[in-house]
């Protein structure tokens, strides 16, 4: 993977069950982070949220930090907020979702890590109060030849259909404008 020119990876650390609300460690997390760090690839993490309140967001952030301990995490720990099939958080208002995201990010920051938010361009416009997220790393997903998000952003996910030698299947492709 490193030989393909990949110099950073954002690895899923875990997620909250869409229906049950249970916290689940990604079954490939340890293998993925160990492989990336062994290859000299800088890593960040993301947690796929289905938190419906601040307390659940703090639980998610705490789990992510607990699993991150012992690894060199130089990129942010992101909260991934998007719609899920029958997702328990799908019906949150824009303001309630923003409160959840801020609680996650502040917990991550209080734990000594960089904090960030991952969402699509339309999600930032319609489901989050993006102006309330200043100070956190903003990672925008927009599968296009250029990112047209008008707000400040630090990373851009431009494809979900990338190919990287050493990884089976499609890979999300990203550009980081900050070195971390």
Task: Please name every model-derived segment.
Residues 56, 60-63, 86-100, 120-129, ...:
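Short secondary-structure transition/capping segments
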Residues 65-79, 83, 127-152:
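Structural recognition of alpha->loop->beta junctions
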Residues 17-18, 52, 124, 147, ...:
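Flexible, glycine-rich phosphate/dinucleotide-binding loops
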